[in-house]
Design a protein with these regions (language model features):
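A membrane-topology feature that recognizes alpha-helical transmembrane segments
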Residues: 1-236
Length: 236
């Protein structure tokens, strides 16, 4: 990696800042403006350390601008907090498009799983709605389990199902119309349960998406550091 130890020091500093952001978001449901500003202002040091040209710098600025516009739209519809908007925009100055897209996908998986789990915990179980409550909890378990399975596959680099497992499943499947009918029933149950989960909340919750952004950022940083270290050891 261009910049050597200085690049690794910057990555460590960014990872530390992200962990601080996660802790403050959990404790106070907000991320300090000074922290977001520090992350943004440190980005030029990262560009210098990694040898970015002017064209690449302009591309990073454009990526940050697009990120800011999109996240502001989410802020307007109350799907993202102001601190989350600033943090994700600041991170867009650090990551190239491909790693940043990976960060956004990881953020969506982590944030989605966390928000659904919190909604299940906050579910208002009313008398006479036991079936719908069960569907809601089942839908949330399916959602969280699916997100965790994808995250595990990404972390280990292994597919969700091996080729042998897929072949075994295909061999044991019943007739096509039965499979389609079961799939429709599962989807209908999931949809009904999810709608009930959204409608029956004890109170309005603010999901700490800053935690998901921070953890996703640390994840991508760790991958970049390991890849760079492996490449350096191969060259040496």
């Amino acid at each position: 990696m261009p910049g050597g130890l200085f690049s690794y020091a910057l990555m460590a500093a960014l990872a530390t800042a992200l962990l601080v952001a996660a802790v403050t978001d959990i404790k106070r449901r907000e991320i300090d403006n000074t922290l977001n500003l520090a992350i943004a202002l440190a980005a030029p040091l990262w560009w210098l350390a990694t040898g970015l040209g002017w064209w690449d710098v302009g591309f990073q600025l454009a990526l940050a601008l697009v990120t800011f516009v999109v996240t502001c739209a989410l802020f307007v519809v109350r799907q993202m907090g102001g601190g989350d908007v600033k943090l994700l925009t600041a991170l867009a100055l650090w990551f190239a498009p491909a790693p940043f897209l990976q960060l956004v996908v990881l953020m969506a998986l982590l944030g989605g799983a966390g928000s659904v789990a919190m909604a299940a915990w906050n579910l208002d179980r009313r008398p006479g709605e036991s079936v719908r409550s069960a569907l809601a909890l089942g839908a949330s378990a399916l959602w969280v389990g699916g997100a965790l399975a994808v995250l595990t596959a990404l972390a280990t680099g292994r597919p969700l199902l091996s080729t042998a497992a897929l072949q075994s499943i295909r061999a044991t499947l019943p007739a096509g119309w039965i499979v389609a009918l079961i799939a429709l029933l599962v989807l209908a149950g999931f949809a009904l349960g999810f709608v009930h989960l959204v409608r029956r909340q004890k109170s309005r919750m603010r999901v700490p998406y800053g935690v998901a952004i921070a953890l996703a950022g640390v994840w991508v940083l760790a991958q970049q550091a390991l890849t760079s270290a492996a490449a350096s050891s191969t060259v040496n």
